[in-house]
A protein has these predicted regions:
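Sensor-1/coupling segment of RecA-like P-loop NTPase cores
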Residues: 141-157
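Phosphate-binding/switch region of NTP-binding enzymes
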Residues: 154-189
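Phosphate-binding/switch loop-helix module in NTP-utilizing enzymes
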Residues: 83-145
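Hydrophobic anchor at the start of a short beta-strand
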Residues: 41, 149, 167
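Catalytic phosphate/metal-binding cores of nucleic-acid and nucleotide-processing enzymes, i.e., regions
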Residues: 8-12, 145
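Conserved nucleotide-binding/hydrolysis micro-motifs of P-loop NTPases
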Residues: 47-50, 76-79, 123-124, 155-158, ...
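Pre-Walker A adenine-sensing motif
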Residues: 1-7
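Conserved P-loop
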Residues: 11-110
């Protein structure tokens, strides 16, 4: 097939999932690429609550991009993650935060105002039943036809993979956490 035989799509659904590192990092790279090409982008983060490196980075670039960049951090911290879970946050509070974050994501994705909407850790929110798989499917199906969507986090539902135009499974080969070392600032968060 010749290069001329290929077509382009007005928008795509991108999934970054799997047990390995790099899902959020890939989505931040996608954000940089989108903004660098003059796109309007929304970066909406589920689960994460603490001030991780990507939050600091996005907050610093927000003034540069103005109305072309929406950043929303709606998490309450790790959920169902053993000792790493937020101790003072109830299941109901986690679900409420995820629901509010979903509403922001849904509004952004369906508004037609953004070229790309990135929903970081939404797959984890679905896996832990903070929002439903039906919510995720509705987000994908109802998005504006000209809005690309990026969905990150472990455990993307296999039966929804048919809706993805690009799906990448990050595979862990080795991670220092398995040897009881905590995450490193600047590398892991």
């Amino acid at each position: 097939m010749a290069f001329e035989d290929y077509k382009t799509k007005d928008s795509v659904v991108v999934v970054y999932t799997g047990e390995g590192k790099g899902k959020t990092s890939a989505s931040v790279g996608l954000l940089a690429r989108a903004l660098g090409n003059g796109w309007k982008a929304a970066y909406i983060q589920f689960i994460k609550h603490w001030d991780v490196g990507e939050h600091k980075f996005i907050r610093e670039i927000e003034p540069v991009f103005g109305k072309r960049l929406l950043f929303y951090k709606g998490g309450k911290g790790f959920y169902n993650a053993g000792d790493l879970s937020a101790k003072d946050v109830s299941e109901a509070e986690h679900k409420q935060a995820a629901r509010e974050t979903y509403e922001v994501a849904y509004k952004a994705a369906t508004s037609g105002k953004f070229d790309i909407v990135i929903c970081d850790e939404i797959n984890n929110a679905v896996h832990h039943k903070l929002i439903t798989k039906a919510d995720l499917k509705k987000l994908i199906k109802d998005k504006s036809p000209k809005t690309s969507l990026c969905l990150t986090g472990r455990d993307f539902p296999k039966d929804l993979l048919t809706y993805a135009d690009i799906a990448t499974n990050m595979t862990k080969i080795r991670h220092h956490f398995d040897d009881k070392y905590l995450a490193n600032k600047g590398i892991d968060f």
